[in-house]
């Protein structure tokens, strides 16, 4: 999928508005500007931000109500994928995104973009600093599944859904993690990469 096709998919299939696309374009341009000085994303993906990063993040919208009310927490938010993309899409005033990122440089970028786009988000430096109150947890290129389950058990205060973007080792990680009866899951293919999976 090329960049134009990715944009068209966002509009036609995921129902992003033209205003959303404009905001995503500002996000993309800010990312490219920051990336000249800091390593926010791989330089090899700079020409495929719409398909490789934005659409990859936006596909998670299929897994919760588009008018979702409540809190979404993005663990290891990095350059804002998927958390910022989800925040741009959902304008419900009762929808709130928390971004957790340990890198000071990346937190600086997230703060700058969220202020520029007037997004309803909070930024934190460490997922272990508090008992996290969230309905949905999203992760992309974060930790291995056994570590994610451990964090979920130790830091989350209430029942929650976890949505994880994983690479080609997804099934191997599932086979090697201990899931008790409180957890159930399904796995499906990513629309942006044949080797990637989404675990819900």
Regions inferred by a protein language model and the residue ranges of each:
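A short glycine-rich, Lys/Arg-flanked "PGG" loop and its adjoining helix->strand segment in the class I
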Residues: 149-162
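Conserved beta-strand signature within the Rossmann-like core of class I S-adenosyl-L-methionine
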Residues: 159-171
């Amino acid at each position: 999928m090329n960049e134009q096709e990715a944009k068209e998919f966002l509009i036609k299939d995921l129902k992003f508005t033209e205003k959303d696309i404009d905001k995503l374009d500002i996000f993309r341009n800010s990312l490219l500007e920051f990336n000249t000085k800091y390593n926010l994303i791989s330089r090899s993906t700079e020409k495929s931000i719409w398909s490789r990063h934005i659409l990859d993040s936006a596909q998670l919208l299929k897994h919760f109500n588009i008018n979702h009310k409540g809190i979404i927490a993005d663990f290891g938010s990095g350059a804002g994928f998927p958390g910022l993309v989800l925040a741009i899409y959902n304008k419900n005033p009762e929808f709130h995104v928390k971004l957790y990122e340990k890198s000071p440089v990346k937190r600086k970028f997230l703060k700058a973009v969220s202020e520029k786009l007037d997004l309803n988000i909070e930024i934190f430096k460490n997922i272990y600093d508090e008992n996290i109150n969230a309905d949905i947890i999203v992760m992309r290129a974060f930790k291995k599944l056994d570590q994610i389950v451990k964090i979920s058990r130790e830091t989350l205060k209430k029942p929650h859904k976890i949505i994880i973007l994983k690479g080609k080792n997804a099934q191997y990680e599932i086979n090697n993690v201990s899931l008790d009866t409180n957890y159930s899951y399904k796995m499906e293919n990513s629309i942006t990469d044949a080797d990637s999976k989404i675990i819900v």
